[in-house]
Design a protein with these regions (language model features):
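Soluble N-terminal domains of membrane-associated systems
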Residues: 1-114
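Transmembrane alpha-helical segments and their cytosolic interface motifs
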Residues: 118-151
Length: 151
């Protein structure tokens, strides 16, 4: 299957890549700049829009909204994808950007049909990533810094 690339300029003014598929449809290809922007938005807001019902879910939706808009051109699909990311999410902030990148890859490849897969992936990864992230950020780092400062 051959794919042709067209450089396009979206509403925000940044250059993205549209893939022309053999069936005549176009699909947005997520760039490294999109992933970095999503991670930065999430890291900035993860604890600011925290609530006890969905924990960090609103931060996930807010961080992914610009890229989801590029992936989903139709308003109905965009709203459905965005609502899917408002569900419960709780993991260490530093590690969560990897989970968001993986979910964006699935959204990009499979579209709205994979919304249950996206939610399952987030649910299955947030626990292990929280365990590793909490150990690194809240146990290992303070122990090393305390040892150095006490020396």
């Amino acid at each position: 299957m051959s794919k042709m690339e067209n450089n396009t300029v979206n509403k925000a003014g940044s250059t993205g890549v549209e893939l022309n598929l053999n069936d005549g449809t176009q699909r947005y290809q997520v760039t490294k700049k999109d992933l970095k922007k999503t991670a930065d938005r999430y890291n900035f807001m993860a604890c600011n829009i925290f609530n006890y019902e969905s924990q960090m879910g609103p931060a996930v939706a807010w961080a992914m909204a610009p890229v989801l808009r590029k992936i989903y051109k139709k308003d109905e699909e965009y709203k459905e994808a965005l609502n899917n990311h408002f569900n419960y999410f709780n993991s260490t902030t530093v590690m969560s950007s990897m989970i968001l990148g993986a979910t964006l890859a699935i959204e990009e490849k499979d579209g709205i049909e994979a919304k249950e897969t996206v939610q399952s992936l987030k649910t299955s990864l947030m626990g292990p990533f929280a365990g590793v992230g909490d150990t690194l950020v809240w146990v290992l780092w303070p122990t090393i810094m305390g040892s150095i400062s006490g020396y």
